Amino acid sequence: MVGVFRLEGHSVRLQSLRGIAALCVAVGHAFTVMRNGRIEDAHFTLRPGNALLAAGELLFQPNTAVILFYVLSGFVLGESLRRRAAPNERSHLGAFGVRRLWRLLPVMWLSILFAAAVAVLLRDATFAGTTSWFDQFSSVAVSPAILLENLLGLSHSINSVLWSIQIELVMIVLLPLMAWLSARTGLWLDGVMVGALYLGAIEFWGVVPNFVLFAYCFYLGAALPKFLSNAMVAR
């Protein structure tokens, strides 16, 4: 009988894959600055002048990369939860939360402060050839109250791309529950859970909070060891 697949220790390959996904997101957002080559636009027409940009956007597809990154996060963090020992469950979960906050908050705060400075310095500035998504950064409202709200992770109004970090913060609480549930269910029920969360995301897109929409990615990642084990048995 083959046991459940386990990730033992730090995996350079997995971390590299997460890094590639993060890089695709960053480069993909750079493409959203320019009007040419916006393949999401309903009126997009492929022309020689925008073909290179369109190809680059397909190669560095940020939406797909975000999903891959979240699945890998669910996998790596779920395995970290199972692997690390602690005197009791409360200490175990507390240590997990502290580690995650230490990794996420400093970078998030630095990004917010930089974006706030840019918003103040470039207030009402205009740039030729940029998209409305980029132009909105020159009209971002910045005040002590708004800054505090963003620093606490309650809003991403100053730097809109930080919606993805907000999801990671919520998952500090939800991922241990997902890992606990997946450890006590069968493979078929895991598949049903992932499918239900995915269909719910499609049905309620734009209605429910973002962390609900992407919960299926993290649950799939947490359950991935069982799917991998089943694939190895099938061989």
Give the role of each language-model region:
Residues M1-R13:
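Short, Lys/Arg-rich, polar N-terminal cytosolic tail immediately upstream
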Residues V2-F5, L77-R100, M232:
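Membrane-helix interface linkers and caps
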Residues V12-R82:
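Functionally critical transmembrane alpha-helices in membrane proteins and complexes, commonly lining
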Residues Q15, A21-C24, S138-R235:
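Aromatic-enriched alpha-helical transmembrane segments of multi-pass intramembrane proteins
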Residues C24, L68-Y70, V76, W109, ...:
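Hydrophobic residues within membrane-embedded alpha-helical segments of Major Facilitator Superfamily
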Residues G37, D41, R83-A85, A119-A128, ...:
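Transmembrane helix-loop junctions in multipass membrane proteins, especially transporters and channels
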Residues R47-L58, E89, L93-A95, L104-L169, ...:
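Membrane-interface helix-loop-helix regions
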Residues I67-R83, L122, L169-A179:
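Transmembrane alpha-helical segments in integral membrane proteins
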